[in-house]
């Protein structure tokens, strides 16, 4: 009995000693994990380029828009040439100019390795403002397929909102992502109320209406990724901002095809 009691006491002591040791080992392993994670992030910052403000800048930032720019210029020129003379041609010119400004300034901002914070800040303000201009510009030629009683009120509201958004982003350059996204999505959803009228309009019809809706969905999906800063498919190369840019390219493609269909039917 004495032997058994002694063995039990020994086991209890060993167990009591092992617990703190296991806890120490766990804490040490956790500390090593945190250190490795910090080292990895530091190495990632050294490998991944940064902008003038010190923010990480994945290598493919802006290249989607740079590739899209010459295609956008060509599409805009052809669209203006085939558009009927008068207000419709002017509307197509406005749309083309807003698209070229969007992709051109974005490529200039994101691809060129600016080191001047002042230049970067100005280009950022223009970049954010262009979002509102492309939304208003896209709606302009499409609205000429509808009656004047619908066209002019919508043009007034959309361009007024675009002007407000543009001024806001020029004055409030450091606006948080969520504030920018909320205004962007609200303005993008405004034309949704026109979808029934577009569906039945002789110069628009179902095909162009579906393309317009899909383009809007692509813009909104990209903006959502920008707001939540996810996903980041290839860290250091292709992250949430690049996903946002792809959304704008897909949205533009859907819309420019739809506008071609509308203009050819006018």
Enumerate the language-model features and the residues they cover.
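Multi-pass alpha-helical transmembrane bundles in non-GPCR membrane proteins
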Residues: 1-266
């Amino acid at each position: 009995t004495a032997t058994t009691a002694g063995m039990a006491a020994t086991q209890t002591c060993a167990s009591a000693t092992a617990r703190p040791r296991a806890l120490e080992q766990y804490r040490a392993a956790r500390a090593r994990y945190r250190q490795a994670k910090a080292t990895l992030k530091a190495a990632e910052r050294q490998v991944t380029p940064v902008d003038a403000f010190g923010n990480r800048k994945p290598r493919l930032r802006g290249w989607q828009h740079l590739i899209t720019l010459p295609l956008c210029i060509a599409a805009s020129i052809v669209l203006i040439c085939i558009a009927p003379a008068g207000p419709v041609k002017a509307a197509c010119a406005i749309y083309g100019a807003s698209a070229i400004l969007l992709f051109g300034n974005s490529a200039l901002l994101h691809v060129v390795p600016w080191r001047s914070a002042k230049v970067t800040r100005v280009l950022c303000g223009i970049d954010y403002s262009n979002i509102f201009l492309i939304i208003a510009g896209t709606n302009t030629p499409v609205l000429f397929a509808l009656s004047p009683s619908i066209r002019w009120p919508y043009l007034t509201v959309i361009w007024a909102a675009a002007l407000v958004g543009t001024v806001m982003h020029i004055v409030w350059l450091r606006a948080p992502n969520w504030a920018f996204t909320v205004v962007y999505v609200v303005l993008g959803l405004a034309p949704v109320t026109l979808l029934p009228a577009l569906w039945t309009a002789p110069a628009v019809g179902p095909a162009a209406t579906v393309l317009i809706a899909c383009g809007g969905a692509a813009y909104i999906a990209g903006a959502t990724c920008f707001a939540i800063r996810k996903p980041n498919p290839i860290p250091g190369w292709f992250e949430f901002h690049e996903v946002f840019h792809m959304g704008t390219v897909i949205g533009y493609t859907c819309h420019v095809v739809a506008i071609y269909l509308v203009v050819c039917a006018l």
